[in-house]
Amino acid sequence: MIKLSNITKVFQQGARTIQALNNVSLHVPAGQIYGVIGASGAGKSTLIRCVNLLERPTEGSVMVGGQELTTLSESELTKARRQIGMIFQHFNLLSSRTVFGNVALPLELDNTPKEEIKRRVTELLDLVGLGDKHDSYPANLSGGQKQRVAIARALASNPKVLLCDEATSALDPATTRSILELLKDINRRLGLTILLITHEMDVVKRICDCVAVISNGELIEQDTVSEVFSHPKTPLAQKFIQSTLHLDIPEDYQARLKASPETDSVPMLRMEFTGQSVDAPLLSETARRFNVNNNIISAQMDYAGGVKFGIMLTEMHGTQEETQAAIAWLQDHHVKVEVLGYV
């Protein structure tokens, strides 16, 4: 549905040249939810704006629904953009218009008959859970409700593609979850192709089928969500995955934690499990093989793309030789082990 080929975007600021995107290629199949994740300034907003030519690429090809957009005339591009809805971090609603009026606006601009506008807007407001807010104004809505209005407006022209530019960044966690569930529901009901950009791996984990990691204007990793979470290939992908697992060292352990081993101290380990290593009884196996005992301090497990992954803090009790051998064995079995110190 979306195919970007060798996209390069260069901005000129006086004598200064800024390369925002460098030879980026991305394919989003029809009906998928595809996430692009990156830090601020990585180029993700520029990338998504190239899809509907809000930013015209310096080089490269933009195909949406089998149509090459970069060669279209202005009138042809305007028509093609009706198939591409877009929502933003800031809702961009017209304060002087009711909820109904905001959603109706693109239909009015397209000279849609009034009866059809009424039918379509009512249908969309029911879809996004705002069937009782027809006559409300944006000032009387919560942030989540405003984004729901923006989603309804973006769907007014029956687009095949929805672009989401940091659509949940301004929302609290609970509202973010509800908006993501709405997008997932719309994707399932309408078969809508969704391309979203974000700096939060929690967003990707919750609804995306595939994910690409962008850094300094280049896509450095892209695959299914389950594959990236199970076998991240780049340090940046690993960092984003770690950010979804929030496991702090308890205060009493922090007070006792030493950088070097002392008499009778034991190593404190941080272990990360992905894929098959999550379900395998690896800790009990190390106890049998190496005569070590693991005291689990805290642990957390989650799912992404149908794959389980988890993190654990433990004390490993045993001789230095046995604990080193046990750690090496765990690493051989796809567990990432970090010695945080000694307690």
Curated annotation (Swiss-Prot):
Catalytic activity annotation: L-methionine(out) + ATP + H2O = L-methionine(in) + ADP + phosphate + H(+); D-methionine(out) + ATP + H2O = D-methionine(in) + ADP + phosphate + H(+)
Keyword Cell inner membrane: yes
Positions contributing to ATP binding: G38, A39, S40, G41, A42, G43, K44, S45
EC number: 7.4.2.11
Superkingdom of source: Bacteria
Disulfide bonds: none
Alphabetical list of InterPro entries matching this protein: AAA+_ATPase (IPR003593), ABC_MetN_proteobac (IPR012692), ABC_transporter-like_ATP-bd (IPR003439), ABC_transporter-like_CS (IPR017871), ACT-like_dom_sf (IPR045865), MetN_ABC (IPR041701), MetN_ABC_transporter-like (IPR050086), NIL_domain (IPR018449)
Compartment(s) of residence: Cell inner membrane
Any one cellular-component term (Gene Ontology): plasma membrane
Residue stretches making up the ABC transporter domain: 2-241
MF annotations from Gene Ontology: ABC-type D-methionine transporter activity; ATP binding; ATP hydrolysis activity
Coiled coil feature spans: none
Membrane topology, record value: Peripheral membrane protein
Keyword annotations of the record: Amino-acid transport, ATP-binding, Cell inner membrane, Cell membrane, Membrane, Nucleotide-binding, Translocase, Transport
One Pfam family from the record: NIL
Oligomer and partners: The complex is composed of two ATP-binding proteins (MetN), two transmembrane proteins (MetI) and a solute-binding protein (MetQ).
Record NCBIfam families: ABC_MetN
Role played: Part of the ABC transporter complex MetNIQ involved in methionine import. Responsible for energy coupling to the transport system.
Similarity comment text for this entry: Belongs to the ABC transporter superfamily. Methionine importer (TC 3.A.1.24) family.
Protein name as annotated: Methionine import ATP-binding protein MetN 1
Species name: Salmonella paratyphi A (strain ATCC 9150 / SARB42)
